């Protein structure tokens, strides 16, 4: 079974949101995936300056885990750690989550670059994740 870990990383490389698909990932494996994601942040920064696209595709690999990235205009990073390569599904996932993220930014009660704690946002990301993965 393939697992997908999705993270939203803030401007100061602080985690804003994290979710795993399916939810049955062991805690030990979660820490390894967080370590892999953190290690790829410098690579994301390099790719941002080389491309005009928000979707950076697969930027790095670690063993069987591939890391795809999407960077917003405000330099918020979306990372997806995955084993299977399905570019269309990954790009569509990023675009739909980006739309949700923009709605969060429009919320007057949300502080920019702070962790996202909205249960509605979480439920919608889960729904999008099950749709594509």
Swiss-Prot record:
InterPro entries per the UniProt record, alphabetical: Longin-like_dom_sf (IPR011012), Sedlin (IPR006722)
User: Is GTP-binding tagged as a keyword?
Assistant: no
**Where found in the cell?**
Cytoplasm, Perinuclear region; Endoplasmic reticulum; Golgi apparatus
What are the recorded Gene Ontology BP terms?
Answer: endoplasmic reticulum to Golgi vesicle-mediated transport
Superkingdom of the organism of origin: Eukaryota
- One Gene Ontology CC term in the entry: cytoplasm
Q: Which UniProt keywords apply?
A: Cytoplasm, Endoplasmic reticulum, ER-Golgi transport, Golgi apparatus, Transport
Which family does the entry's similarity section mention? Belongs to the TRAPP small subunits family. Sedlin subfamily.
Q: How does it assemble?
A: Part of the multisubunit TRAPP (transport protein particle) complex.
What is the purpose of this protein? Answer: May play a role in vesicular transport from endoplasmic reticulum to Golgi.
Q: What is this protein called?
A: Trafficking protein particle complex subunit 2
- What gene does this protein come from? trappc2
């Amino acid at each position: 079974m393939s697992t997908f870990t999705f993270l939203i990383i803030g401007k100061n490389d602080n985690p804003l949101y994290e979710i795993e698909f399916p939810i049955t990932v062991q805690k030990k494996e979660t820490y390894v995936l967080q370590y892999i994601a953190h290690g790829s942040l410098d690579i994301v920064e390099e790719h941002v300056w080389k491309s005009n696209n928000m979707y950076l595709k697969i930027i790095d690999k670690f063993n069987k885990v591939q890391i795809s990235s999407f960077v917003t205009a405000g330099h918020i990073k979306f990372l997806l750690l995955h084993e299977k390569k399905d570019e269309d599904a990954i790009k569509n996932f990023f675009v739909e989550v980006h739309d949700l993220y923009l709605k969060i930014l429009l919320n007057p009660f949300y502080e920019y670059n702070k962790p996202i704690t909205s249960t509605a946002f979480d439920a919608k990301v889960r729904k999008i994740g099950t749709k594509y993965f």
